[in-house]
């Protein structure tokens, strides 16, 4: 299990979750790679730091996820080099949606981070659909995780509280 927030705090937790907080964005995921009843790998990376203000998570095909992460990292880096400015979180989510629309990738992605002092979080489906929300869960355990998120989330949540809720949602 892995929990990551924009302050590089790493803890152990279970399922893919993103939570916007008044002072940041918190991400959590299980670390097991599975296909149905088969556990393919016990320690799979599912949270990726794209740059110093954008993080993404993946649920789905490992190969597609690794490919998608490389493309997103390249697009964000190219933008920064060409424009001498950081790509916004919303722009990175839009680029990711466009990539997903261009071909079938069997992944569901959370992408979020901070633009200045504004936290934002997006869910991207395999067809490139993009939805912004304050908290999101993906993967097979998301139904149970949403129960915790809906019960505990509030607008003034801090990243410390968000970490606690993310771990609870993952372990639910």
Spell out what each predicted region is:
Residues 1-105, 131, 136, 142-164:
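Conserved short S/T/G-enriched processing/targeting/catalytic segments and their helical context
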């Amino acid at each position: 299990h892995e929990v990551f927030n924009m302050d590089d705090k790493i803890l152990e937790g279970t399922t893919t979750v993103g939570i916007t907080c008044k002072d940041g964005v918190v991400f959590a995921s299980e670390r097991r790679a599975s296909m149905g009843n088969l556990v393919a790998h016990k320690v799979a990376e599912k949270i990726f730091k794209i740059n110093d203000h954008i993080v993404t998570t993946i649920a789905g095909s490992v190969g597609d996820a690794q490919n998608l992460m490389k493309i997103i990292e390249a697009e964000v880096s190219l933008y920064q080099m060409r424009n001498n400015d950081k790509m916004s979180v919303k722009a990175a989510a839009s680029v990711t949606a466009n990539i997903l629309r261009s071909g079938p990738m069997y992944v569901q992605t959370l992408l979020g981070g901070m633009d200045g002092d504004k936290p934002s979080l997006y869910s991207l489906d395999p067809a490139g659909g993009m939805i912004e929300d304050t908290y999101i869960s993906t993967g097979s355990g998301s139904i149970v995780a949403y129960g915790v998120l809906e019960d505990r989330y509030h607008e003034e949540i801090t990243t410390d509280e968000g970490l606690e809720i993310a771990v609870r949602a993952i372990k639910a």
